[in-house]
Amino acid sequence: MAISLSNNKHTAARTKSRLRRQVRGRKRVSGTPERPRLVVTRSSKHISVQVVDDLVGKTLASASTMEADLRGFSGDKTAKAKKVGELVAERAKSAGVEGVVFDRAGNKYHGRVAALAEGAREGGLTF
């Protein structure tokens, strides 16, 4: 993995903690063709998610708040994250995916990440 956990004085403690959690979690989470990995990427403004088959290295479905489908959606960031979860569930089901392994990428399971997972579950994906 290309994640550096060096003691750079310019790296915030919160970022170091997230990277440490990401490395620990990534050791245990792997996507297969039967249960691909649902990867969450969160920034301060947007959230994106991909359904990835790690054995082939292929993205099966994806969704993001930066898409034209969600640009006009009014609501706070948590509501948009839930909508992204529902959208990726719809796209994954059309690609033939029923169950996924949730990879929060070191983010805490709280707020927007939890809302995205809830939206994906309501969309029909099983974790």
Swiss-Prot record:
Residues 1-34 are annotated as: Disordered. Signal peptide: none annotated. Residues 11-29 have a biased composition (Basic residues). One of its GO terms (cellular component) is cytosolic large ribosomal subunit. InterPro entries: Ribosomal_uL18_bac-type, Ribosomal_uL18_bac/euk. GO terms for molecular function: 5S rRNA binding; structural constituent of ribosome. The keyword Aminoacyl-tRNA synthetase does not apply. Keywords: Ribonucleoprotein, Ribosomal protein, RNA-binding, rRNA-binding. GO terms for biological process: translation. It comes from the Bacteria. Pfam families: Ribosomal_L18p. Residues 1-10 have a biased composition (Polar residues). NCBIfam families: L18_bact (TIGR00060). Part of the 50S ribosomal subunit; part of the 5S rRNA/L5/L18/L25 subcomplex. Contacts the 5S and 23S rRNAs. This is one of the proteins that bind and probably mediate the attachment of the 5S RNA into the large ribosomal subunit, where it forms part of the central protuberance. Belongs to the universal ribosomal protein uL18 family. This is Large ribosomal subunit protein uL18. It comes from Nocardioides sp. (strain ATCC BAA-499 / JS614). The lineage of its organism: Bacteria, Bacillati, Actinomycetota, Actinomycetes, Propionibacteriales. The gene is rplR.
